[in-house]
Amino acid sequence: MYMNNKYEIIKSGENKGRIRALRSFGDVKKDDIGGFIESETNLSHNGDCWVFDDAKVYGNAMVFDNAKVYGNAKLSGDAEVFGNEKLIKSRI
């Protein structure tokens, strides 16, 4: 694990695991539990991007920059959320 990583994936025996913040940034505090991702390619360690609540990001989908994914939103395929975008209770 690199010193600059902002989260770790807590595997739950399925393909997707919950994320846990390793440091505070933006609206996220150290040790906050976030949503689900399939791998580190789904969520950047740079910027203030985060997957909140029960949101899921998987496949080749990516969240980066300062983008946020909330609620029970699902991001999959080759979808990207970036910049200051917010995805709330949507399926892309």
Each language-model region and where it sits:
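A detector of tandem-repeat and repeat-rich interaction/domain scaffolds
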Residues: 44-91
